[in-house]
């Protein structure tokens, strides 16, 4: 099951050329670019691990692509995403993010239904990868 998170989540995988164009767009907007990775892609897991420091001072898309490739080589079986941070007053938030690396096998999620008092049903989702293996050995 292909995880759909981020700006281009329903499109086919971006090529390095397309990623470079998106990085150039982010840099032209004055946004700071950062890289994050995780082995737990649960939709509520918004706090991924930072790969290095945010690239506030880097203004070259080729340099950022080198960092992306470095992250891909370091974590080939993890999800890696690019985030673009807008530091403009009143925005101060991530304004764009997209996945640039995925594990070869994405097992997906399962729906868990729990019965609560008063005929209440509570639903949640769990990642098959998290259920089967501990952190760091999921993919």
From Swiss-Prot:
Heterohexadecamer of 8 large and 8 small subunits. HAMAP family: RuBisCO_S_bact. Pfam families: RuBisCO_small (PF00101). This is Ribulose bisphosphate carboxylase small subunit, chromosomal. The lineage of its organism: Bacteria, Pseudomonadati, Pseudomonadota, Betaproteobacteria, Burkholderiales. The basic functional RuBisCO is composed of a large chain homodimer in a 'head-to-tail' conformation. In form I RuBisCO this homodimer is arranged in a barrel-like tetramer with the small subunits forming a tetrameric 'cap' on each end of the 'barrel'. RuBisCO catalyzes two reactions: the carboxylation of D-ribulose 1,5-bisphosphate, the primary event in carbon dioxide fixation, as well as the oxidative fragmentation of the pentose substrate. Both reactions occur simultaneously and in competition at the same active site. Although the small subunit is not catalytic it is essential for maximal activity. InterPro entries: RuBisCO_ssu (IPR024681), RuBisCO_ssu_dom (IPR000894), RuBisCO_ssu_sf (IPR036385). Keywords: Calvin cycle, Carbon dioxide fixation. GO terms for molecular function: ribulose-bisphosphate carboxylase activity. SUPFAM superfamilies: RuBisCO, small subunit. Belongs to the RuBisCO small chain family. GO terms for biological process: reductive pentose-phosphate cycle.
């Amino acid at each position: 099951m292909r995880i759909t998170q981020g700006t281009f989540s329903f499109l086919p995988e971006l090529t390095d050329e397309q990623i470079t164009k998106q990085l150039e767009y982010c840099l032209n907007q004055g946004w700071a670019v950062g890289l994050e990775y995780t082995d737990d892609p649960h939709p509520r897991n918004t706090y991924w691990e930072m790969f290095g420091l945010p690239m506030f001072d880097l203004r070259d898309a080729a340099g950022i692509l080198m960092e992306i490739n470095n992250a891909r080589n370091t974590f080939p079986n993890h999800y890696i995403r690019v985030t673009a941070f807008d530091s403009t007053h009143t925005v101060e938030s991530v304004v764009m993010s997209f996945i640039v690396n995925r594990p070869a096998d994405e097992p997906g999620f399962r729906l868990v239904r729990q019965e609560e008092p008063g005929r209440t049903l509570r639903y949640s989702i769990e990642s098959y990868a998290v259920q089967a293996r501990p952190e760091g050995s999921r993919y």
